[in-house]
Amino acid sequence: MDINEAVDQFYKALNDIIAGDIEPMKEIWSHADDVTYLDPSGAFLVGWDDVLASWQKQANLNIGGDVHPENLHVIEVDNLAVTHNFEIGTSHLRGGNEPVNIRVTNVFRKEDGRWKIISHHTDLMDILE
């Protein structure tokens, strides 16, 4: 899998989270102790267990809606890759179609020949604070 396929896999997994399914997100993330997640509620999480708990909380909300990356910029060097982009879409958390438009940075590391996310940093989203 190349880095662009990994990005696609992450956004599929993110849309699955929005629909309440956490399983694909578990596949794209590294389960290492050094992973980090600066989540949309403002939390700064370190380690797979804490990162997983945040994603599970979001999946349990079963928000509905969809997001996709725009203006994707990829930097790839050896076994690390960094992506910067906007996440654009809609959220149905409050019963309507609230726009989503945030900035995102992802860091991927190649583990056993596959790209895995080791860091995800988003802008704050008041719907998840």
Which residues make up each language-model segment?
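A beta-strand edge to alpha-helix "cap/lid" segment located at domain peripheries
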Residues: M1-P24, S30, D34-E129
